Amino acid sequence: MAEQPSRQQILQTQYNSYKSRLQQIAQKIVDLETDADEHKLVMDTLNSMDNNRRCFRMIHGVLVERTVGTVVPILKTTQEGIQTAMNGLLDQYKQLEAEFQKFQKDNKIQVVRQ
């Protein structure tokens, strides 16, 4: 007959799960911040150029020729989408962090570091 996991093992598994999910969300936020910074850099560069000037944009691995005037609105929309996603992930992170802290408090978990 298989032995049931102890309460300590269950709590350790839940603790590790919370930590892992928090790290995953934090990594996604960092990735989106990097994308947002890159979009801002491109937007700053393109805003100082003539709208009829040719530029190239990578779409799913294909380099497509466009004009600055057609690319800037698309980049602006993408940048807003990135910001919305970041805000959603930040809210999700804060909610999960509060849930994690409640879990620690309810189960009287103290982190011991060596």
From Swiss-Prot:
Entry GO CC: cytoplasm; prefoldin complex
Query: Keywords, A to Z?
Result: Chaperone
- Which Pfam families does its entry note? Prefoldin_2 (PF01920)
| Keyword Metal-binding among record annotations | no
GO BP of this protein: protein folding
Which domain of life does this protein belong to? Answer: Eukaryota
* Entries under CDD domains matching the protein: Prefoldin_2
Report a single Gene Ontology molecular function.
unfolded protein binding
Reply yes or no: does the keyword Chaperone apply.
yes
Into which family does the record put it? Answer: Belongs to the prefoldin subunit beta family.
What is the documented function of this protein?
Answer: Binds specifically to cytosolic chaperonin (c-CPN) and transfers target proteins to it. Binds to nascent polypeptide chain and promotes folding in an environment in which there are many competing pathways for nonnative proteins.
Question: How does this protein assemble?
Answer: Heterohexamer of two PFD-alpha type and four PFD-beta type subunits.
Name the record gives this protein: Probable prefoldin subunit 2
